[in-house]
């Protein structure tokens, strides 16, 4: 098995793509000693194409709850009784202060994230004003995650300083309807393509541990590759009480590590970003940075707590890695 891993690794260094069947073979055969061989190879691929730099980003839940969509994993959906805090669009000062604070702590990217399929025109204008002010007053890269937007809206975001748009595919096309029925996979892809057309970089990934198969995960990784996604966040399902996935069995550690490694093999030049659910991984995902990951969301998530920024920075430095500042 080690020879197969090395052969595929060499293919990637020669700018050849791993095939779907090769990815399946790597995942299914990587146990015990072979697991370490797989993780080591993914780490070398990460180093070859991305160096030892780790990108830290942070997010702000800028509008919480009351979402019309039925995503089975989500605490913010109106379809489920999850007892989360609900509020309308945050104000300028709160967003500006958090962006400043995160920059001072060493964060490279900052994003507003809003609930709902799309923002109202009024809320979208508020978001534009907030981004315009942050861009003027804080030296930090700006990202946005505001749902399904048109090309013109995405162009407006770019014009006020946003450089990257986040919009997850969540899972494979085949499994998607088991997770969401209120909007389509193609609507998500259209938003991604509109963002690229507007000149924005794109951050798009998914959630693992929702009952999908290994094949679904690998199909997602190849879909992201076909879309030339620059930043791929991998979330681990943190089952929320009141949602349909409340009683879903949590993934084993090795399953998470293998998934990250395979995503690195399939997308060697992308940023593989640890996202929600890091608290379910040993040491807040420390081992993932030896399995191909080279980016992470630091601080709190949307409705759950994350790792402290200073703790993340210490962890990254302890691994001999550097921060992208």
Swiss-Prot record:
Domain of life per record: Bacteria
Keywords: 2Fe-2S, 4Fe-4S, Biotin biosynthesis, Iron, Iron-sulfur, Metal-binding, S-adenosyl-L-methionine, Transferase
Keyword S-adenosyl-L-methionine applies: yes
GO molecular function, one term: biotin synthase activity
Binding site for [2Fe-2S] cluster: 111, 143, 203, 273
Broad class of enzyme this protein falls into: transferase
Cofactor or coenzyme needed: [4Fe-4S] cluster; [2Fe-2S] cluster
Disulfide bonds: none
Residue intervals of the Radical SAM core domain: 49-278
Biological pathway: Cofactor biosynthesis; biotin biosynthesis; biotin from 7,8-diaminononanoate: step 2/2
Catalysed reactions, as listed in the record: (4R,5S)-dethiobiotin + (sulfur carrier)-SH + 2 reduced [2Fe-2S]-[ferredoxin] + 2 S-adenosyl-L-methionine = (sulfur carrier)-H + biotin + 2 5'-deoxyadenosine + 2 L-methionine + 2 oxidized [2Fe-2S]-[ferredoxin]
EC number, as in UniProt: 2.8.1.6
Example GO BP: biotin biosynthetic process
Organism: Clostridium tetani (strain Massachusetts / E88)
The protein's name: Biotin synthase
Residues reported to bind [4Fe-4S] cluster: 67, 71, 74
Subunit details: Homodimer.
Family assignment from sequence similarity: Belongs to the radical SAM superfamily. Biotin synthase family.
Details of cofactor binding: Binds 1 [4Fe-4S] cluster. The cluster is coordinated with 3 cysteines and an exchangeable S-adenosyl-L-methionine.
Function: Catalyzes the conversion of dethiobiotin (DTB) to biotin by the insertion of a sulfur atom into dethiobiotin via a radical-based mechanism.
SUPFAM superfamilies: Radical SAM enzymes (SSF102114)
């Amino acid at each position: 098995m080690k020879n197969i891993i090395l052969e595929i690794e060499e293919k990637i260094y020669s700018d050849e793509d791993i095939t779907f069947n090769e990815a399946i073979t790597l995942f299914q055969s990587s146990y015990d000693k072979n697991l370490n061989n797989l993780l080591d190879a993914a780490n070398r691929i990460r180093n070859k194409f991305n160096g030892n730099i780790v990108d830290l980003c942070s997010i702000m839940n800028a509008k919480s709850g009351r979402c019309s969509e039925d995503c089975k994993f989500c605490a913010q959906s109106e379809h489920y009784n999850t007892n989360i805090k609900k509020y309308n669009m945050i104000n300028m000062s709160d967003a500006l202060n958090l962006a400043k604070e995160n920059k001072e702590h060493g964060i490279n990217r900052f994003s507003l994230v809003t609930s709902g399929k799309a923002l109202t025109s009024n809320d979208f204008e508020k978001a534009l004003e907030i981004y315009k002010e942050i861009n003027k007053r804080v030296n930090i890269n700006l990202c946005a995650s505001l749902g399904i937007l048109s090309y013109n809206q995405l162009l407006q975001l770019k014009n006020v300083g946003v450089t990257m748009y986040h919009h997850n595919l969540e899972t494979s096309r085949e499994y998607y309807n088991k997770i969401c029925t209120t909007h389509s996979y193609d609507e998500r892809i259209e938003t991604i393509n509109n963002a690229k057309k507007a000149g924005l970089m794109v951050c798009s990934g998914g959630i693992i541990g929702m009952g999908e198969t290994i094949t679904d995960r690998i199909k997602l990784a190849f879909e992201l590759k076909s879309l030339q996604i620059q930043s791929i966040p991998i979330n681990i399902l943190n089952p929320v009480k009141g949602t349909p996935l409340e009683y879903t069995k949590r993934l084993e550690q090795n399953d998470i590590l293998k998934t990250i490694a395979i995503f690195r093999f399939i997308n060697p030049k992308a940023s593989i970003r640890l996202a929600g659910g890091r608290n379910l991984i040993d040491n807040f995902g420390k081992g993932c940075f030896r399995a191909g990951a080279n980016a992470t969301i630091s601080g709190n998530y949307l409705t759950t707590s994350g790792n402290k920024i200073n703790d993340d920075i210490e962890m990254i430095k302890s691994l001999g890695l550097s921060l992208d500042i």
